[in-house]
C-alpha cells in the first residue's frame, strides 16, 4: 500500500544517514555490512519493510543478530526511522535501506544474509505481472545468491492466491519443506512458529479472524 507523502520524510532521511542508507550508498556497502554493524553477527533482511514495526521488534528481541529493512517508499522508511529513534538505548543492530528490492544482489554479496523475511508483499494478481511477485523465479535466484548455505526465507501473507503461487514457485525452484514449516492458519498453529512476531497488517487481519499463511523454506 502506497503511503501519502509527508513533507518531513526526505529531510528526516537526509539527517540520519547512519540509520537510513540510501540506494547508491547501500550498493557501495555490498559485501561490507559487517563493517557497518561493527561485528559479524548473523544478518537478517526484510524486503518491503514498510513502516518498520516488524523489523524493529526483531531488532529489540534479538540483539545478538543484525537486521536490515529494505523499503522503496521514503515516507515509510522515515516513519520506521522515527520509531527506531524512540528506542532507548539506540538500536545498534538495525539499519534501513531506502531502495528497490528488484534485485537484492545489488546490495548484498554472495552468502551475506542468514534469513530473508517477506511480509504481506504485493500479490500482483494479474498474470502479466507475475515477474513482479517477490517469490517469482527471478527473485528466488537473487535470494539464493545472497543467502548463506541452508539460509532461510520466511513468507507471511493473508493472500491465498499469492501463497499458493509461492508454493508452486518454490517447488519449481527445487525447494522443499517439512510439514512443521508451513501453515494455512498460523495463529491457530503457533507451535509451528512459536517465536512469531506479528506485523502491523497481521494484527489487523487477526482481529478480523482472517487466516495468516506462513512458510519457511531453506535454500
Curated annotation (Swiss-Prot):
Pfam families (alphabetical): Methyltransf_4 (PF02390)
Coiled-coil stretches noted in the UniProt entry, renumbered to this chain: none
Gene3D superfamilies (alphabetical): Vaccinia Virus protein VP39
Xref: InterPro entries: SAM-dependent_MTases_sf (IPR029063), tRNA_(Gua-N-7)_MeTrfase_Trmb (IPR003358), tRNA_methyltr_TrmB_bact (IPR055361)
Record field: catalytic activity: guanosine(46) in tRNA + S-adenosyl-L-methionine = N(7)-methylguanosine(46) in tRNA + S-adenosyl-L-homocysteine
GO cellular component terms, semicolon-separated: tRNA methyltransferase complex
Keywords linked to the UniProt accession: Methyltransferase, S-adenosyl-L-methionine, Transferase, tRNA processing
Claim: Protease is one of the keywords in the record: no
Binding, substrate: 126, 158, 199-202
Homology family: Belongs to the class I-like SAM-binding methyltransferase superfamily. TrmB family.
Protein name in UniProt: tRNA (guanine-N(7)-)-methyltransferase
Organism: Oenococcus oeni (strain ATCC BAA-331 / PSU-1)
